UniProtKB/Swiss-Prot annotation:
Pfam families: EFG_C, EFG_III, EFG_IV, GTP_EFTU, GTP_EFTU_D2. Coiled coil: none annotated. The lineage of its organism: Bacteria, Bacillati, Bacillota, Clostridia, Halanaerobiales. Residues 8-282 form the tr-type G domain. The gene is fusA. It comes from the Bacteria. This is Elongation factor G.
């Protein structure tokens, strides 16, 4: 099957935003105008096309990023819908990895919310070119220019308006286009009919001022435009668009547009901007990877004539076809029914069917080409972040890093007969979501699930019931504490010697143990010289230490951020074995960690509460009562924003408490910030449990 759209006319974009900025509605409208959906779904009715999992429709939030295809002006646009809720940032990170450009959506009233900052930082990390759309211009308190200021202050973005609104709130009627210097006014409710007219008199002066700002911003990035601008020459629309496109692709400028997706205004102009300014797969640097055979770096250019390479970025359990693997093709062509090589795992798999997903129906494809996003049926052993490629030209593309879960709960089926069903279902869900982990507690035999927050785990339990028909009970959430040491201890001995009749055991090690900075993990340094311990036993010593670290020395939590130097020891010709050295390593670690002033660390969350003035005192008092550390306050519209660091252990049930304290008028977001030592009195409680 030949390529349907040239690479130059393909756009892979994501829509990133804070919860409630109107992302799903905007995507809906895009699908409507590009002719793929005939009746628009409203999130308020739970009918939006993108939100295809049932719980999303109930909660009105988007959880999984479905990849959807549509066309506009002879271009193919693949949209990845990304969730905006803090517990799902991993989904966002995962989708940013496979996009070429993004639309950052802001609410005209709320502006830059905490989650927008997180997502923006993630997009900076992957150098994603973006344009911004200030949505909800029809809402009370909408202020386009304030949002621009917030983008500059809070995100450090070089935000340049390409449009200004005509009116706002109920009087929002249209848009002034600063690139073409005319106005767009809408003729009907569906916003399909609009016309370009002269800029209304009372907006002329403001339009000219912002046009000047636009030209100034562009001339700083483009010398030719700078010359023309300084000499007062006319700059054509095409020249302006070309320079703007370059600025966006270099991630030096963020053009800002405005509109109201709900009222169907501004969406077509947003689609035009996607085509004018966001990159095609050819405009982004070729993807880099490592050849697993030679361990050398290689690149894959976006082109059908290159060897096939793709990245699996999402796994979903689909009720009709089983496991769906969403993947992005970076180079080459893939035929349905052919074999691919999973270079991350080192084995071959056969692709069954290839589906191009539209939000609620799917189209079968015989083949997919460089730059395409599609879903494959039949890949049994491929996980998120795996590379799929041509076996004769293997490459491993950089995988994604996922944060460790911060919260865990025990889970059990309501009837014991469903235990196997539960285990299978949890395994399927863990395959889909790398930040969701399942393990069995060896001491109690309980199944423990871990995730990124209460909502994350609630959604999982919800899905168990709906998709897998397993009714489960969950225990009280537990915090993922860690342990570490605070001082260096040298010459710690670990001896494991049993020499009484028969084959003996002999392992003897001497180590230094010292703390590392937060987040540095575990470092093992081998300084054995002169064969004091034979080479083949060294890995066993490390294994013994790593295993002992899993259960810490204070309260059974994993020990982190420490360095062990193996410096001496002794062995016995006959009695030494890997097992003996493994046990010696573990004895030395426990001994050393006990002496190195161990402490318990707890996860501290970055909490932001948006609260009406009159409840401010109660909210701050409550945060202090939760061992919170208030970092600052600022006004936002008619509310106050309180920022604080609060231990996760104190945040359980906060949503309910906050609702009752403020009659439901305050909202909060929290995300993991860092670990810090627990106060002594609380450490005693934790150890005593």
């Amino acid at each position: 099957m030949a390529r349907q759209y040239p690479l130059k006319k393909t756009r892979n974009i994501g829509i990133m935003a804070h919860i409630d900025a109107g992302k799903t509605t905007t995507t809906e409208r895009i699908l409507y105008y590009t002719g793929r959906v005939h009746k628009m779904g409203e999130v308020h009715d739970g009918a939006a096309v993108m939100d295809w999992m049932e719980q999303e429709q109930e909660r009105g939030i988007t959880i999984t990023s479905a990849a959807t295809t549509c066309e506009w002006q002879k271009h193919r646009i693949n949209i990845i819908d990304t969730p905006g809720h803090v517990d799902f940032t991993v989904e966002v990170e995962r989708s940013l990895r496979v996009l070429d450009g993004a639309i950052a959506l802001f609410c005209a009233v709320g502006g830059v919310e905490p989650q927008s900052e997180t997502v923006w930082r993630q997009a900076d990390k992957y150098q994603v070119p973006r344009i911004a759309f200030v949505n909800k211009m029809d809402r009370m308190g909408a202020d386009f220019f304030h949002v621009i200021e917030m983008m500059e202050d809070r995100l450090g973005a070089n935000a340049v308006p390409l449009q200004i609104p005509i009116g706002s709130e109920d009087d929002f009627e249209g848009i002034v286009d600063l690139v073409t210097m005319d106005a767009v006014v809408y003729k009907d409710d569906l916003g399909v009919k609009y016309e370009r007219v002269d800029i209304p008199e009372d907006y002329r002066e403001q339009a000219e001022e912002y046009r000047e700002n636009l030209l100034e911003a562009i001339s700083e990035l483009d010398d030719e435009i700078m010359m023309k601008y300084l000499e007062g020459e006319e700059i054509t629309t095409d020249e302006l668009k070309t320079a703007l496109r370059k600025g966006v692709l270099d991630v030096e400028i963020v053009p800002v547009l405005c509109g109201s997706a709900f009222k169907n205004k501004g969406v077509q102009l947003l689609l035009d901007a996607v085509i004018d300014y966001l990159p095609s797969p050819v405009d982004v640097p070729p993807v880099e990877g490592m050849n697993p055979d030679t361990e050398e770096e290689e690149i894959r250019k976006a082109g059908d004539d290159e060897p096939f390479s793709a990245l699996a970025f999402k796994i979903m359990a689909d009720p009709y076809v089983g496991k769906l693997t969403f993947f992005r093709v970076y180079s080459g062509v893939l035929e349905a029914g052919s074999y691919v090589y999973n270079s991350t795992k080192g084995h071959k798999e056969r692709i069954g069917r290839i589906l191009q997903m539209h939000a609620n129906h799917r189209e079968e494809r015989e083949s997919v080409h460089a730059g395409d996003l599609a879903a494959a049926v039949g890949l049994k052993n491929t996980a998120t972040g795996d590379t799929l490629c041509d076996e004769d030209h293997p490459i491993v593309l950089e995988s994604m890093e996922f944060p460790e879960p911060v919260i865990s709960v025990a889970i059990e089926p309501k009837s014991q007969a469903e235990q196997d069903k539960l285990s299978l279902a949890l395994q399927r869900l863990a395959e889909e979501d790398p930040t969701f982990k399942v393990r069995t507690d060896e001491e109690t035999g309980q199944t423990i699930i871990r995730g990124m927050g209460e909502l994350h785990l609630e959604v999982i339990v919800d899905r168990l019931l709906r998709e897998f028909k397993v009714d489960a009970n969950i225990g009280r959430p537990q915090v993922a504490y860690r342990e570490t040491i605070t001082r260096k201890v040298t010459d710690v001995e670990g001896k494991f010697i049993r020499q009484s009749g028969g084959r003996g055991q002999y392992g003897h090690v001497i180590i230094d143990i010292e703390p590392l900075e937060e987040g540095e993990g575990f470092e093992f340094v081998n300084k054995i010289v002169g064969g004091a311990i034979p080479k083949e036993y060294i890995p066993a010593v490390e294994d013994g230490i790593v295993e002992a670290m899993e259960n810490g020395v204070l309260a059974g939590y994993p020990a982190v951020d420490l360095k062990i130097t193996l410096k001496d020891g002794s062995y016995h010709e006959v009695d030494s074995s890997e097992m003996a050295f493994k046990i010696a390593g573990s004895i030395a670690f426990k001994e050393g960690a006990q002496k190195a002033s161990p402490v318990i660390l707890e996860p501290i969350m970055d909490v932001e509460v948006v609260v009406p003035e009159e409840y401010m005192g109660d909210v701050i008092g409550d945060l202090n009562g939760r061992r919170g550390n208030v970092q600052g306050m600022e006004r936002r519209a008619s509310a106050q924003v309180v920022k604080a660091y609060v231990p996760l252990a104190e945040m359980f049930g906060y949503a309910t408490d906050l609702r009752s304290k403020t009659q439901g008028r305050a909202t909060y977001t929290m995300q993991f910030s860092h670990y810090e030592p627990v106060p002594d009195n609380i450490a005693k409680e934790i150890i005593g449990k």
